[in-house]
Each structure stands twice: as structure tokens, then as C-alpha cells.
A protein has these predicted regions:
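Catalytic-core regions of core metabolic enzymes
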Residues: 1-105
């Protein structure tokens, strides 16, 4: 007998991830061609809040860059994680602690 359970989420429970009012880019970068730089570039015309997160920078372009997801002034609805795979698990845990609505890895 299988003990596997499937959890089905309603659209309302996924709204913050699917229709975010704010997005954090964890691993944001100014390095040309890096994943963090490309994600930020793709969000250039996004009308919601964009929070670059990387302890190496104080600013990226005209945006304040936060040293960690827990230092972002309000929990973003979505976080795009662009860090090295060895750091992903801890970043996801930090996102949960910070109250992020959902993550994209």
C-alpha cells in the first residue's frame, strides 16, 4: 500500500507566485551574460517591485541591492534564485523564513 499523497493547490494559493506584485532576484549580478544579470534585464520593464539580492553589491543600476532575502523591506511575492546549486537549499529556506510567496529555481 502506497503512502504517497498528492497535494493539489488551488489557484488562489498560488496567486503570489503566478501573478507577483514584487520579485526578488537572488544572485542578481552586473556580470554580462550571467543568469542573474539576464533575469534582471528581463525584468527591466516589469511594473511591480524588483529587489536585486546579492551581498557583493550595494546597487545594481538604479536599484538598491540587498545583502540577503531577509533584508528586503517587504516579503516579495516571488523570488527567482540564480545562485550556484550548492547554495540553493539554504536560499530556499531563507525565502521561507522571510515569507516569500514562492520561488523559481
Amino acid at each position: 500500500m502506497s503512502t504517497h499523497r498528492t497535494t493539489v493547490y488551488r489557484h488562489a494559493e498560488l496567486a503570489r507566485l503566478l501573478h507577483p506584485a514584487s520579485v526578488a532576484v537572488i544572485g542578481a549580478s552586473t556580470r554580462p551574460g550571467s543568469f542573474g544579470e539576464r533575469v534582471l534585464d528581463n525584468l527591466a520593464n516589469y511594473t511591480g517591485g524588483v529587489y536585486p539580492v546579492n551581498a557583493r553589491y550595494e546597487r545594481i543600476g538604479d536599484r538598491i541591492c540587498y545583502p540577503s532575502i531577509t533584508s528586503v523591506p517587504q516579503p516579495p511575492d516571488c523570488a527567482v534564485i540564480t545562485v550556484a546549486r550548492d547554495a540553493v537549499e539554504q536560499v530556499v529556506l531563507d525565502c521561507a523564513k522571510a515569507g516569500v510567496g514562492g520561488v523559481i529555481v
